[in-house]
Regions:
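Flexible, glycine-rich surface segments
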Residues: 261-377, 385-386
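N-terminal secretory signal peptides that target proteins for export/translocation
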Residues: 1-33
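Acidic helix-start/capping segments at beta-turn-to-alpha-helix junctions
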Residues: 130-156, 205-209, 218-226, 328-335
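Surface-exposed patches in mature extracellular/periplasmic domains of secreted proteins
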Residues: 127-136, 197-203, 262-267, 293-296, ...
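C-terminal soluble interaction/assembly domains
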Residues: 328-450
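Bacterial N-terminal signal peptides
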Residues: 30-49
Length: 450
């Protein structure tokens, strides 16, 4: 039996208690939901930026063993608190395929784990128990979501150049220019209010969903319930289930408070929603009503998406007016120091002066070394098979980008896509270079090097 999943939420938001009058499907039936892959949002390459080329799971990036070098003994990183786990990278599905979602209806009716969850929601958030029981009786187990969160049998080989070309392609750049032109006033307002440059906001939204083109067709309630209570048997199962349980809780509170039908919200198979692909916990914590209509809609309102991304970055420590990365000189000594200090940690934990004393040289003529000597940095490694690994220094703002998705590749792709779009805006006369960009020769006026 084939069922067509609705592509959009109902045009009129429903009250939480309006959704329980439809008969549920027989419990014995299993369905396959069939979609063209493009309509499904490429199922992974585009959700949460799909950090496929990185082998580290986003929930627990493993530090790489630094290569040995004579300068290594001089490098003593400062201890830093460990960042919170983030959603795992998404596996990819090839374009042109037909995608089927396999679901099992009524899996969560008369379920002891669901009953305990409902009791908790009633006690802590004043939900109606009967309404929640009726709701979960209509929730389906998504076997597809459970399969897609499984780690690959063998880790993919990291390839920065392939990843970079995927997210800095002409489609995204041209769509970014169109998005920027259509939202120039809102982007500038967000930049002024939150201190985040328009190009960074544009870069994130472009990498995440190509400016709302691919936001996901999984029913969010099904995906979150499946992953909260039936996460696959992996080593990190308990931690992942706890994360998705919290997001399911926040999803129900958010949809109730926003008068949205929880069965009508669509998103990625990990529960990320809308143009910026926010998980429900992030929606509750960081999303803002930026078009002033009284409610937050990350799927339909580009203004809400822009303001929410800017607020997320600000709340995670974005430093206004500061760089994202610095280039490292290509000489053998500098590259050797970078290799030795590249330990996979995204938070800035080396003091710049330590690396300089070890022999690293910056390729940044406009940087005042004396005033930046105490700046904390991290070494960003960008491996490509068959080529020498590229290295950059990441500053606090680079780390903030990894808080959106814990991947070096992701953070640099966001930065470079934003710079590429900004360069095209300036070249077309739609954007005037700032005096600071013109004076320093910053990459704002030039596409990032490949």
């Amino acid at each position: 039996m084939s069922v067509i999943l609705p592509r959009n939420r109902p045009s009129r938001p429903l009250r939480f208690d309006m959704i329980f009058h439809q008969p549920a499907a027989p419990a014995s039936l299993a369905f396959r939901l069939r979609f063209p892959l493009a309509a499904l949002s490429l199922a992974a390459t585009l959700f949460a930026s799909a950090a496929v080329a990185q082998t580290q799971p986003a929930a627990a990036v493993v530090a790489q063993e630094p290569a040995q070098s004579q300068s290594q003994s001089q490098l003593q990183p400062q201890p830093q608190p460990q960042p919170q786990p983030q959603p795992q990278p998404q596996p990819s599905v090839q374009q042109g395929q037909t995608f089927e979602e396999e679901i099992i209806p009524q899996r969560y009716a008369n379920n002891a784990k669901i009953d305990a969850f409902i009791a908790d929601m009633v006690a802590r958030h004043d939900f109606d128990a009967n309404a929640l029981h009726a709701l979960f009786a209509r929730v389906s187990y998504s076997a597809t979501a459970a399969k897609l969160v499984m780690p690959a049998p063998s880790p993919a080989v990291k390839n920065w150049r392939v990843y970079q070309s995927r997210f800095l392609d002409a489609v995204r750049v041209n769509a970014g220019v169109k998005f920027w032109r259509a939202n120039q006033g809102t982007l500038q307002r967000a930049s002024t209010e939150f201190g985040v440059p328009p190009e960074v906001i544009v870069g994130i939204i472009g990498v995440e969903t190509i400016y709302g083109r691919y936001m996901g067709n999984f029913r969010t309630l099904d995906a979150l319930t499946t992953l909260a209570f039936d996460y696959p048997n992996t080593p990190n199962r308990d931690a992942r289930q706890a994360t998705f349980r919290k997001n399911l809780e926040d999803f129900l509170v958010w949809t109730r408070d926003s008068q949205l039908d929880p069965t009508g919200v669509l998103g990625s198979y990990t529960g990320a929603v809308g143009i910026p692909q926010f998980l429900p916990s992030s929606i509750r914590d960081y999303a803002v009503d930026y078009d002033g209509n009284g409610h937050i809609d990350l799927r339909a309102s580009q203004a809400d998406a822009i303001g929410s991304v800017a607020n997320y970055l600000k709340q995670h420590g974005w430093e206004t007016g500061r760089p994202v990365v610095w280039n490292i000189a290509p000489d053998t000594g500098s590259q050797g120091v970078a290799q030795a200090a590249a330990d996979g940690r995204p938070e800035p934990h080396w003091v710049l002066s330590q690396l300089l004393r070890a022999g690293l040289v910056l390729d940044e003529p406009s940087v005042n070394i004396a005033s930046e000597a105490s700046t904390p940095v991290t070494v960003v490694d960008l491996p490509t098979p068959g080529r020498a690994t590229e290295y950059k220094l990441g500053l606090q703002n680079f780390y903030v980008l990894t808080r959106y998705n814990r991947s070096f590749f992701y953070a640099l792709a966001v930065y470079q896509l934003g710079e590429r779009v900004k360069a095209q805006m300036e070249a077309s006369g739609a954007l005037t270079p700032s005096p600071a960009d013109a004076a320093t020769g910053s990459p704002a006026a030039q596409p990032p090097s490949e």
